[in-house]
A protein has these predicted regions:
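Short Gly/Pro-enriched turn/cap motifs at secondary-structure boundaries
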Residues: 6-8, 185-191, 206, 236-240
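Conserved S/T- and glycine-rich ATP-binding loop of Class I adenylate-forming
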Residues: 14, 20-23, 31, 56, ...
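Short beta-strand->loop structural element characteristic of the AMP-binding/adenylate-forming
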Residues: 28-31, 58, 80-86, 161
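Gly/Ser/Thr-rich phosphate-binding loop
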Residues: 76, 101-106, 115-183, 196
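Conserved ATP-binding/catalytic segment of the ANL
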Residues: 205-210, 214-252
Length: 252
């Protein structure tokens, strides 16, 4: 006890292995360096302006890459993080009230459940202390603009942000909407802090604005490799760019 281990850790050392969901085949082991994890924490803090006074409510399980990366923002800011085991609307609102949460990360079904519970009278907002809740962050799937319109009806002062991310590029943050762009609800956003984004055709050439192509991202959060799978790695990593396999287009 009290003796520091004789080990030197650098940003480029291996830090963690995450697993893909396996939707297109067997799950792949995704190897990330310490640099990836640290950068993801900085990105989260930068995007949402987290400070020591913020309280972040994390509802998804921590084995989910996005949940872990959002939570890391609290480590950078020195703020408090609350982990909630359960997704019932009344549990979420009670946690926000009792823990005085300022930032809450929701998935689309959970936000819909909260709104449905409000509109059915199942929950009464005046029972809870919610005035400190400043930011509703939602993601991990497409967000219907109609959902945010409903949400603003009951929470008109909330900031809103969404993002695009994937485990190979350390979860959320490589593309995010930004709280200043609520008028662009339905879009995934622009390049996140420290990230580059491009959209390419089948030959790898950057497409023009408005044209459809493959979304590619580049930044400190890109994985090192698929562990022990060079073939799969070489298919998606090109000159530092991660070819996501997702289709996108750039608007104005």
């Amino acid at each position: 006890c009290g003796i520091k281990p004789d080990v030197e850790i650098t940003d480029d050392d291996n830090a963690a292995i995450y697993f893909s969901s396996g939707t297109t085949g067997f799950p792949k082991a995704i190897l990330h360096a310490h640099r990836s994890l640290v950068h993801s924490a900085i990105v989260e803090q930068k995007h949402h302006g987290q400070t020591h006074d913020d309280v972040f409510l994390c509802i998804p399980p921590l084995y989910h890459t996005g949940a872990k990366m959002h939570w890391f923002g609290s480590l950078i800011s020195g703020g408090k993080a609350v982990l909630l085991k359960g997704i019932k609307p009344e549990w979420i609102l009670q946690a926000v009230s009792e823990e005085e949460c300022t930032i809450v990360w929701l998935l689309v079904p959970w936000a819909q459940d909260i709104l449905d519970a409000i509109e059915s009278g199942e929950v009464k907002l005046d029972k809870y202390k919610l005035d400190q809740w400043r930011l509703m962050h939602i993601g991990a799937q497409p967000v219907p603009p109609s959902l945010i319109k409903r949400w603003k009806k009951y929470f008109p002062n909330h900031q809103y942000d969404t993002n695009y991310g994937l485990s190979e590029s350390i979860g959320p943050g490589c593309v995010h909407l930004g709280v200043e762009n609520i008028h662009k609800v339905g879009a995934i956003g622009k390049a996140g802090y420290g990230w580059e984004v491009k959209i390419v055709d089948k030959d790898g050439n950057t497409v023009k604005q408005g044209e459809v192509g493959e979304l590619c991202v580049k930044g400190p959060g890109v994985m090192r490799c698929y562990y022990n799978d060079k073939k799969a790695t070489d298919e998606v990593l090109k000159d530092g760019w991660h070819l996501t396999g997702d289709i996108a287009k750039e608007d104005e």
